[in-house]
Swiss-Prot record:
Organism: Mycobacterium tuberculosis (strain ATCC 25618 / H37Rv)
InterPro entries tied to this protein: Metal_resp_DNA-bind_regulator, Tscrpt_reg_PadR_N, WH-like_DNA-bd_sf, WH_DNA-bd_sf
Record's keyword annotation contains Transport: no
Free-text note on domains in this protein's UniProt record: Contains an N-terminal winged-helix-turn-helix (wHTH) DNA-binding domain and a C-terminal alpha helix, which is mainly involved in dimerization. Binding of cadmium causes subtle conformational changes in all key metal-binding residues and conserved DNA-binding residues.
Keyword terms: Cadmium, DNA-binding, Metal-binding, Transcription, Transcription regulation
Function: May have transcription regulation and metal-detoxifying functions through which it may enhance intracellular survival of mycobacteria. Binds to its own promoter region and to the Rv1999c promoter region. It displays strong affinity for cadmium ions, but can also bind zinc, manganese and nickel. Expression increases the intracellular survival of recombinant M.smegmatis in murine macrophage cell line and increases its tolerance to cadmium ions.
Residues that bind Cd(2+): H16, E30, H34, H101
Gene Ontology molecular function terms on file: DNA binding; metal ion binding
Domain of life the protein comes from: Bacteria
Annotated protein name in UniProt: Transcriptional regulator Rv3488
Length: 107
């Protein structure tokens, strides 16, 4: 997966985990709806890394009659999401805003 797509997947995960508890199967479906093909071999290491970084917490729960690990954003995860949103807004303004930038002019 390319770096920009990894960052987008991270942003999606934090976005959804900030509002609700999420689990891997649901995230796979949700990401697929947005055009991302994320295998379990990519998704679960990403979830584990976000948890190790203190951005998510998880616990085992019964969901739809099955034992599943559910994830939710921590306060640090919500703060990271806010920072990511700001960075994305700035990038979108620069790249999609229609502004002309000349190399070397400092803008």
């Amino acid at each position: 997966m390319r770096e920009f797509q990894r960052a987008a997947v991270r942003l999606h995960i934090l976005h959804h985990a900030a509002d609700n508890e999420v689990h891997g199967a649901w995230l796979t479906q949700e990401l697929s709806r947005h055009g991302y093909r994320v295998s379990p071999g990519t998704l679960y290491p990403t979830l584990h890394r976000l948890e190790a970084d203190g951005l998510l917490v998880s616990e085992q729960r019964v969901v739809d009659g099955r034992a599943r690990r559910v994830y939710r954003a921590t306060p640090a995860g919500r703060a990271a999401l806010t920072e990511d949103r700001r960075a994305l807004e700035e990038l979108a303004r620069e790249v999609l805003g229609g502004q002309s930038h000349t190399a070397g002019n400092g803008t």
